[in-house]
Amino acid sequence: MTASARLDGRQLTGMPALHRECRREFGLPDFYGNNLSALIDCLSGVRDDDGMSRFVLAPGELLDIIVTDADLVRLQAPEVLAALEDVVEEVNLRHAEAGAAPALRLLLR
C-alpha cells in the first residue's frame, strides 16, 4: 500500500515556501517550527498516529512525496529539492534504526 502527498513545484520558490506547502499538504501541527529538523520530527511519526501529520501509515506502507513541476524547482530553488532529499533520507534512517521499513519515497515529476 502507498499513500501519497503532492507538493506543487510551482509554489516551491524557496525554503519558506517549502515549509508552507509541507504544513498544508502533510497537515502539520500549528506549532510546527518551519525548519528541517521539525519537518523530520513530524514525518518520522507517520506510523505512530502521534498527530504530527495527517498521515498514519501501516507497517511496511510508504508515503510517496510527489513533487510536481520538479524541473522548475530544480531551476528556481534547487535547495528545496536537496532539503527534501535530506528529509526523506533522515526519516528513513530513523525507521531503519528502529528495525522498520522505509516510510517515505520522493518522486520528482
What are these regions, as identified by a protein language model?
Residues M1-R109:
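Positively charged, polar, low-complexity stretches
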